[in-house]
Amino acid sequence: MPAYLIVQQTIRDAEKLEEYRVKVTPVLAKYGARFLTKGAGHKLLAGAGALPERMAIVEFPDMATLIAWYNSAEYQPLIALRQSAVDPNTEALITLEGA
């Protein structure tokens, strides 16, 4: 069953985020992940609160693969780069199992 990584971010440093994107793309591919959508074209339909600047949904083959990617030796060095590029008060990485 597929699993999804939902990413919410507000950008602090666009150049660092681009560097992260370039470096993380082949690591995601190695784990069979693909972006379903990404960008800033989201709207709040109900509820209250601030929206992040960007969102993404990444599909993985299953939850075990998603967790293996996150914990992998290839991805661990990229976490600090990602964190330096975004506002830590608005960033969230959320996992969701597919139905």
Where on the chain are the PLM-derived regions?
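Short S/T/G/P-rich N-terminal loop/turn motif that feeds into the first structured element of a domain
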Residues: 1-75, 95-99
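Low-complexity, intrinsically disordered Gly/Pro/Thr-rich segments
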Residues: 76-83
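C-terminal end-helix/capping segment
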Residues: 83-99
